[in-house]
């Protein structure tokens, strides 16, 4: 599956509303097929439930390959991290070439640094991603840890 667009809203009382626009090569041309969509929904619910039941750290990701198009027209990866609301929350903006598993790698890196996502806007345009996150966490309050987070995120988005 590929995530074309996502919006993530997290409340202070640990509730989340996440919406994803997903495509699947297996469903190409069948998005108006109710049976195919029901199958996709069942599969995704089972995968989410399995992940919730595991209650363990996120597994290592298998790095996806860049497409020929992304290799032919490379994009300079970019990360911007800006404080908002008296440094309580931070806006993280990432621009990079897309590849399978990239969003997962970003999420895993944020988790490893103890960062929680309060709001996210995930956009995929062809081979390019423009993702914006509103994040918070102890690591953001210390410049050295903030720099390490940015370095780790850059390593994720810059690797092919």
Predicted regions and their residues:
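Non-catalytic interaction/regulatory segments
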Residues: 1-160
């Amino acid at each position: 599956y590929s995530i074309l667009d996502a919006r993530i809203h997290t409340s202070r009382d640990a509730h989340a509303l996440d919406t994803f626009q997903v495509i699947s090569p297996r469903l190409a041309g069948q998005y108006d097929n109710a049976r195919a969509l029901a199958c996709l929904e069942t599969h995704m619910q089972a995968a989410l439930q399995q992940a919730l039941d595991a209650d363990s750290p996120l597994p290592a990701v298998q790095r996806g390959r860049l497409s020929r198009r992304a290799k032919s027209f490379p994009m300079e990866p970019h990360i911007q991290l800006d404080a908002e609301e008296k440094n309580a929350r931070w806006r993280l903006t990432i621009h990079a070439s897309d590849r399978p598993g990239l969003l997962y790698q970003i999420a895993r890196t944020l988790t490893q640094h103890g960062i929680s996502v309060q709001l996210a806007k995930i956009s995929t345009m062809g081979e390019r991603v423009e993702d914006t996150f509103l994040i918070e966490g102890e690591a953001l309050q210390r410049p050295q840890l903030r720099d390490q987070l940015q370095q780790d995120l850059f390593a994720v988005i810059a690797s092919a």
